[in-house]
Amino acid sequence: AQNRLSWNNYIVWLPCRAPDGSFFRQKGLIPMSRDVSVGYLNLTTGGILKQAFKCLGDRYGWGGMLESRDCSSYIREVYRCFGWILPRNTTGQLQMPVRKIELAGRCCSEKEQILRALEPGTLLYFPGHVMMYLGYENDNFYVINDVSRLVKEGETMPVRVRSVIVNTLAVRRPNLRTWMEELTLALIPWET
């Protein structure tokens, strides 16, 4: 806030680190045109999707590299806006005591039938990756996720995406199996 009036700004306290490593806080200003919420947002499907789409195009960073997020921390941060503290990685998320639907061992048509009944915002997993289900249209099933690489439909070589994107479950992993084929679990954080 250095030498600025707070007109049309929210005044916030920012945690800072002094040169000697000690903690101090400093006032900061956030323009009123930006998203600010005092407390957690109300958990609604629309709210979850709105928060998820605010990150569209953000850079991927495995384990927080490049001051960025990977798939599990992206999902964690979206749900944190609603007061849900999810574990940092997919292994921990899979152990949460919430409603789970096993998809491993099912054929794609069975998985599609299950997905049609799920609400947007449901989390979908395959080994090493989590994504947020958006819904389906014209037999295409859509997700939003923070992804490093994938094989585009009709191609055989992986491309480095390294971004938050929307894609269908028809894209492939480097092993050339579709994401639909690879799905192992649906997790609904708001149901126990």
Name these PLM-found stretches:
Residues 4-104, 127, 140, 144:
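N-terminal capping segments
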Residues 2-3, 135:
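Short, low-complexity Ser/Thr-rich regulatory SLiMs
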Residues 1-2, 124:
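Generic structural signal for buried aliphatic residues
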Residues 87-155:
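...with weaker cross-activation on analogous glycine-rich loops/strands in unrelated enzymes
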Residues 21-22, 34-38, 133-192:
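Aromatic- and glycine-rich peptidoglycan recognition patches
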Residues 24, 28, 111-119, 161:
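Glycine-rich, flexible loop segments associated with nucleotide phosphate handling
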